[in-house]
Amino acid sequence: MFKYALPLYPTMEISTESWSLTSLERINSFIEIGNQDEMIYINKDDSTKVFDEIKPMRHQILIGNMMSSRSPVDSLILMHGVGTGKTLTAILSIINNISDTEFGMKRALILTPNRAILSSFKEEVFNCCMHHYGAGFHTNVEHEVRNIINELFKFDTIRSFCNKIAIKSDEIIHKEWNASFIVIDEAHDVAPSGIDYPKLNRFMKILSTRKLLLMTATPMRNGSSDLIPLHNLMMKKQVHDISLEEFHGNYVEINRRRPPSEDGDSIVFSVETPKIAFMTKFAGLISYLPSDALRLDNVNVINVGDNTTYGGVLLSTTNIVSHNMSELMERIYSGLLNDNNNTNRRGDVALLDQRQASRFIFPDGQYGTLGYMAWMNSNTGKATLRFKRELRFGSNMETVLGAVEKFSPRYANIAKTVYECARRGEKSIVYDDLVTGSGLLVLATILEAIGMKRGSGSNRNSFVCMTREVMTVSQIVAAQRVFNSPENYDGSIISVILGSRVISEGLTFKDVQHEHVVAHWNDSETEQIIGRGIRVGSHSKLLETLNTPVTVKVYRHATIYNREPDKSVDVIMYATSEMKRKNINTITEALRSIAMTCPELESRSISRTICAFTPHEENISNVVPLHHPTIRRTFMDRLNETFNYEKDEYFVTRMENFCSAYNLNYQSDGGMRLMFILLKLIQTTPQLDINKFINCDGYFVYTTKTVDEYNSCRTLRYPFDVSYKSTKRLYYDTIVSLITEPNLIKAYETNPNYPLTKLPLHVITIILEKAISRKLLLTSDDEHQNAYHIQALDTFKQYYHIVYESGGGSNSNSATDIKAVCWLSASVAGESTKYRICVSDQNTWKDCPDDMKEQVNNIKVTKDNTTIFQMREKSLSHYGQKNPFSNDFCLRVIPQNSLSAKYDKRRIASGKKCTTWDNATLGRIKQNLGIESPLLHERTTMSRSDSCKLIESRLEEIDAVVTDVACGVQAKRK
C-alpha cells in the first residue's frame, strides 16, 4: 500500500554498516532450504510446467528467489562459469520478480554486446515464456505469448541503448525505465575506457528502483581493475563509485614481476593482492559458481597437446598443440624479428604482424592484409583462381594438404582433423579472432580445396563461416539453429563452424566434440570460447543417441619458431595468458570468499553455503561488511548539510514529527520496527505512475525535474540511536523478517495502531480502487478479501458504486462498459475531473472521459438520493456526517426533495460542523432524537460540545451517520 511513495532520484547508501553472518544465513537458508524446488512468486501450477519442461537447477532457483521483490538484494554480479545456464537463471529471476504484481518490477530490460547474442537471448525468453504463459491460451498461443513478451521484455544492444538514453533527460529516463529488472549479459564488455560506460552509469544512477543482474563468467580479463565498472553500475550514488586511481591505491596491492628468462626482453606482469578494503567493498555483491561445480555427467573434456616452457618456466596449466614453422614461414618470421625498423617493433604492441605470419604465408611470401588483397577476393571472401591453382584445387586431399604445409602447417593440421572428424559424424568448432588477412577466410578456402562445402548440405562435409564479414546476424542465428537441431547431432547437415568474435560470447553450440582455438592475450577469452560447446545439457541428444559417454577434445594451437621458441608469438601469448590467469585466480578466490552465495566445491554440490572470509582486523571479525545499495539511509537523501542528527534534542524532534504523522511510537521497539518496514517498502517497491515521495515530516510532495532541488529536501537517516540505544540490530532483524515472514506486512496493515485513515488521500483512493476490483472478481466460492480491503470498502462506501458485480444478474458485455465508479477524490476537490471509472477490460481504472462524466454524475446523485431517502425513512430532520481523517462530526439537514443531476455543484454537499450550530437548534435536534425532554424545566444545560457527543452517539445507534471526507473542511467549490 506504500508503493506509490517513491523518490525520483535514488537514496544514498550507508558505507559503515554491515550484515552479520547470522542475518545472511537467515536470508539464504529461507530462500534455499525453504524453496529449493520452487520460486517464491511463480505459483505451483506454473512452476511445475517450467520445471517439467526446462528443469532449472537449484542454483538457478536460488538466484531467482534472491532477486525477488521480497529480497533486499537489488544488485548482483552473476559470476557463474560458462555453461552453467546464466541465461535461464536471468529469465527465471525476471519472471519470478514480475509475477509479484504487488511489489515486483514493471518490466525487464535485456542488454547484450551484439545482436547475435541478443537474438539467442530472445529465443531463450520465448521458449521459457511458452512454458510459463502458453498454457493460459487455447488458440494463437505463439502470438499471445509474443504479445506478453513484447509487453514485459525490452531488448537492445548495449551500444544502441546507450545512444538512445544519451539524448534523454533524467526525468524522461526515470519515467520510462524506473522499476525495471535490468540484465546485462557479458557485462565484462562494459569497459571503463569505452564510450558506453559513462552513459550506462548515468542511466543506473537516475533509477530509484530497479533490480540489476550483471552476467559474466569472466568478469576479469586482465586484472582486478576490470571489476570497477561492474561495481560502479551497482552503486546508486556517484559518490560511491570507484576510480582507477582510488582502486589501485586503496583496494589492491600491486607488485610487478618479470619471469626468469635468458632474454632480457621477457614479459613484465603484475601480481595483485586484494586488501581488506577490497573484501569489504565487494562483500555481498557476488554470486559465485565455477564451471566445474556442475558435474557434466558422461561428458569428458580432454585438453590435447603437451605443456611447453617460456623463459625456462613450465606453463603448467596450458596444453599446446605445437606446429613447427615451415621453411618459408621461418624465413618470413625471422625477417620480422630482425628488422629493427619494422613498425611492429616500434608500435605494434599486439604483435599483429607476427600473429598473421604465424597463421599463413601466401605463395609470394606476403601475409596479412597485403597477402589477402593479392590472393583473395575482398568482396566475396573467397580465393582467386591463381590461389586455387597454388592450393591444387581438384586434387586429392593428400596433395592439397601437402601444398598447404609449406604455407601453414597449422591450417593443414586443422583441415585434416576436422575433415576426418566430420566423416566420423563428429562436429567441430574452429575459432580465430582474425578473419581477413591470414585468418579464417583463408582456412575456409583450404577446407573447400579438400572437398568440403560452404553452407548447409549433406554427407557430413559442410561448414559455415560465422563471421560478420560474410554473414548477416540473421544468417548467423539461422545457421546456429540448424547446427543445434536434433537432426544435426552428427553433423549430417553442418559439421564444422568457423567462428570469429561474434560467436565467442553468449551463444551455445550443441553436440560439439572438437574445439580448436588460437592463442589469446588472456585466458578469459579462451575460457569463453571453449564454453560455447561445453555447457549443461549441450550434449543431451548425442548422449541419448549413442548411449555412451561423450569425449570433447580441446586443441590450443601454437605455431613454433624453431630457432628461438621463446620468440614464437603464440608461446608469448599463452605465457602472458597463464600469468594473468594466476593473478586473476587470486582475485577470484577473494571474491569467492565474500560472495553472497557460492558452492561447496569439495563435494561438487551446487547447494548454497555462506563462504565467510576471516579478516585480519579484530574489530570486524564475524562480520561481512556490505557496501552496496541493499542497505541505505532513509528514503530521502539527507536531512541537510548543516543539520546535526547526532544531537539528541534535534534528532528526537524530527523523529516525533515523522512518527506522529504515521501514528508510531518511536520510543518502543514495535514502533521502530514498523517504521523500518514502512521505509523499506517505500525504498524498494517499484514506482508506478505517481512521482511522489514523503518528506521528513511525513507529508507527500511532488518531485522536481532537477536533482539539486530533490537533494535540498530535509530527510531522516537510519539506522540510528534512540535514547542512546542502538536500533541497528533491530533494523537488520526487521529487514530479514520481511523476507522470512511473508505475512508480516499484512499483519501490520491490519494492526489498529496503523489505521487506514492515516494514509494520504490519493493512496487511499488507490487502495479503494484495488479493493473494488478485487470484489468484482470474487465469487461466492472465493476466499474473502483481506481485512484492509474490507476496511476501505466499509469506511468509504459513500464514494463508490458497483454497476456490475460478480455473480450478479446482469453482466457487462462491452470492454468499455462501466463496471464501477469512484468519486472519493472528487468529493474533496469538488471537480468532476476527479471521477474515476473501472471498465470491463481487465478491471482497469482510469480517469473518467468527458463523454462519460454525465453518466457518472447521475450514478453519484442516485447514490446520494438513496442515502437521503434512507434517512427520511427514519423520520429524521438531520443526519450525521463523520470525517474519517479529522474525526470532525457534522450535521446535515435532510432535504425534502431529491437531488437533481443538475443541482448547483458550487454548493458544499457536506453539512456544518456540529459545534458551529447554535444551542437552540441543537436542542431541537436532541428533542427529535428523544435525548432531551420537550419540557423546559426538564432540560439540562450543557455545552455545544457535549450536545454534539450525545447527538453523534444517538445517530450512530440508529445507523444515521455516514462518512464524509469534506465534513469540517472549509473550502470553496469552483
UniProtKB/Swiss-Prot annotation:
Pfam families xref list: SNF2-rel_dom (PF00176)
UniProt motif DEAH box: location: 185-188
Q: Where does this protein hold ATP?
A: H80, G81, V82, G83, T84, G85, K86, T87
Instruction: Outline the extent of the Helicase ATP-binding domain.
Output: 67-237
Instruction: Give the highest taxon in the source lineage.
Output: Viruses
* Keywords recorded for this protein, A-Z: ATP-binding, Helicase, Hydrolase, Nucleotide-binding
Ranges for the Helicase C-terminal domain?
Answer: 413-595
Which InterPro entries does the UniProt entry name for this protein? Answer: Helicase_ATP-bd, P-loop_NTPase, SNF2_N
Enzyme class at the top of the EC tree: hydrolase
Q: Name one GO molecular function term.
A: ATP hydrolysis activity
State which Enzyme Commission number(s) the record gives.
Answer: 3.6.4.13
What is the reaction catalyzed? ATP + H2O = ADP + phosphate + H(+)
Query: What family, per the record?
Result: Belongs to the DEAD box helicase family. DEAH subfamily.
- UniProt-recorded name of the protein: Putative ATP-dependent RNA helicase
